[in-house]
């Protein structure tokens, strides 16, 4: 245990000393490709709601997302992409975001509430596109390294909100945490919907990926979130996202 604590302290010092704190800008355009059986018209109808949520809700809190535009259609080489599929190639998840030859992309399944999954992955790819950003957080007297993922801590259908589609239909939008959520002494707001009552709080189905004894693990608020959180941690470990890969940190 003592050795693990020493290693963690060394890791934190390395991150704080070596890393830049600048936020990467998101792509000017994120292309939405439909590889599912869902009609293109359904996606096109919902797209203005996602764009409005991005511009009016998310970007004012996470400035790196400013100016990003959602475009329905095939992605040219090198473009960021969100792929909508019938079933994702991942265990215990309805969506995920990753890199394809260094290019950020996300996959969204139509199996569950695709609108919530879409906005969840959108929020995360905008802030942590290369899966290399972390937050140095200090719950109580501890110091931890959290993956900078903006929708996982407040995951859950109870916490979604609604924006109108082009035709006026309600589109469900995932809640997201603000930068203040990662700062233990902040006054808030800590998430867009106002569901969290303190920094670092995990809501009922929420989880958080964190660095534990040199490997990525998951903190979770309930048994229901345990499986999904640990599945995501396994994906991070599979890609060996360790200190060698981390390039940007948010101080807590």
Residue ranges and their predicted role:
Residues 12-20:
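Bacterial N-terminal signal peptides
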Residues 39-70:
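Zn2+-dependent metallopeptidase catalytic core
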Residues 73, 77, 81-104:
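Catalytic zinc-binding patch centered on the HExxH motif and its immediate surroundings
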Residues 121-123, 128-131:
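Acidic, glycine-rich loop-and-strand cores that form catalytic or ligand-binding grooves
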Residues 88-90, 96, 104, 108, ...:
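Metalloprotease/metallohydrolase-associated module, dominated by Zn2+-dependent proteases
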Residues 2-12:
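Bacterial N-terminal signal peptides that target proteins for export
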Residues 26-43:
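Fold-level signature of zinc-dependent metallopeptidase catalytic domains
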Residues 111-123:
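Short alpha-helix carrying the canonical HExxH Zn2+-binding catalytic motif
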């Amino acid at each position: 245990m003592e050795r693990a604590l020493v290693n963690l302290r060394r890791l934190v010092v390395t991150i704080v000393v070596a890393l830049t704190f600048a936020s990467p800008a998101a792509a000017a355009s994120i292309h939405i490709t439909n590889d599912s059986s869902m009609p293109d018209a359904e996606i096109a109808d919902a797209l203005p709601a996602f764009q409005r949520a991005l511009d009016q809700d998310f970007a004012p809190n996470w400035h790196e997302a400013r100016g990003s535009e959602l475009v329905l259609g095939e992605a040219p080489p090198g473009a960021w992409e969100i792929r909508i599929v019938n079933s994702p190639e991942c265990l215990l998840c309805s969506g995920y975001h990753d890199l394809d030859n260094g290019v950020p992309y996300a996959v969204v399944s139509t199996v569950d509430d695709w609108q919530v999954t879409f906005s969840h992955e959108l929020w995360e790819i905008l802030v942590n596109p290369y899966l290399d950003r972390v937050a140095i957080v200090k719950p109580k007297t501890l110091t931890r390294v959290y993956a900078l993922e903006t929708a996982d801590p407040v995951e859950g259908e109870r916490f979604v909100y609604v924006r109108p589609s082009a035709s006026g239909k309600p589109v469900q939008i995932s809640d997201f945490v603000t930068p203040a959520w990662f700062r233990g002494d902040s006054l808030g707001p800590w998430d867009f919907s106002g569901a969290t009552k303190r920094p670092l709080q995990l809501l009922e189905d929420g989880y958080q990926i964190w660095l534990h004894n040199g490997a990525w693990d998951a903190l979770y608020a309930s048994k229901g979130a345990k499986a999904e959180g640990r599945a995501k941690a396994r994906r991070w470990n599979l890609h060996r996202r360790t200190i060698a890969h981390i390039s940007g940190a948010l101080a807590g």
